[in-house]
Amino acid sequence: MMPLIDLWTALPLAKLEVGHHFYWYIGNLRVHGQVFITTWFVMALLIAVAFVASRNIQRVPSGIQNLMEYALEFIRDLTKSQMGEHEYRAWVPFVGTLFLFIFVCNWSGALVPWKLIELPEGELAAPTNDINTTVALALLVSLAYFYAGLRKRGLKYFTKYIEPTPVLLPIAILEDFTKPLSLSFRLFGNILADELVVSVLVLLVPLFVPLPVMVLGLFTSAIQALVFATLAATYIGEAMEGHGGDHEAAHS
């Protein structure tokens, strides 16, 4: 046991730091370089898996094609349950991209040994461990449901702000700000907390003790991806439904 612990402590682990970043400068713009590195890794992984799964499509799926078809069916059912039979098809790619990207980002924080890679400043971690990533994803959802509502209902979309009574106008406007805030901070907070707990346990009690926490973190990460995708589909569905008559007409 002692040789294993000595080997672990001898590894060049990055320091456990919060709020320190590896900055890249693009002109006068300063960006978090470590987020771009891990995001590109996740994107490359997803593109590679999609390419392999679709390279030789069989009528009877097997292997990775079977896995991807199961994921597609799951995302399609999720989107359909939140948007209804008539509207869901056009939004399956968007919701599916959100779910798969967040899912792989979250799991990369638990499964990829980012701490073994030292940077001049900061440390590598899951892309969703950075508030900039989660805010960007939440703003994409906000733009999507505004677009969906305006495309489906035209200017009637804005009647939702004064229904059932104009007194609720301030609350309806405030809701448009709280939706992206809740989406972004929920995802960011859960992933950051999970990675901090695992990092502290690895530093204090390496090897076997952190394993149950890591397994729990994988489960939590998957749930967070599901929650984000479900809420995104729900918000888009609500924007297209409107109130009362629109909802009934859409499902008649």
Swiss-Prot record:
Q: Which Gene3D superfamilies does this one have? A: ATP synthase, F0 complex, subunit A (1.20.120.220)
Can you say where in the cell this protein is located? Cellular thylakoid membrane
Q: What are the UniProt keywords, alphabetically?
A: ATP synthesis, CF(0), Hydrogen ion transport, Ion transport, Membrane, Thylakoid, Transmembrane, Transmembrane helix, Transport
Question: What Gene Ontology cellular component terms go with this record?
Answer: plasma membrane-derived thylakoid membrane; proton-transporting ATP synthase complex
Coiled coil segments of this chain: none
| Major subcellular site | membrane
Give the transmembrane ranges.
Answer: 33-53, 92-112, 130-150, 196-216, 217-237
Q: Which GO terms describe its molecular function?
A: proton-transporting ATP synthase activity, rotational mechanism
Family statement drawn from the similarity comment of this UniProt entry = Belongs to the ATPase A chain family.
How it assembles, according to the record, is: F-type ATPases have 2 components, CF(1) - the catalytic core - and CF(0) - the membrane proton channel. CF(1) has five subunits: alpha(3), beta(3), gamma(1), delta(1), epsilon(1). CF(0) has four main subunits: a, b, b' and c.
Please give the name of this protein: ATP synthase subunit a
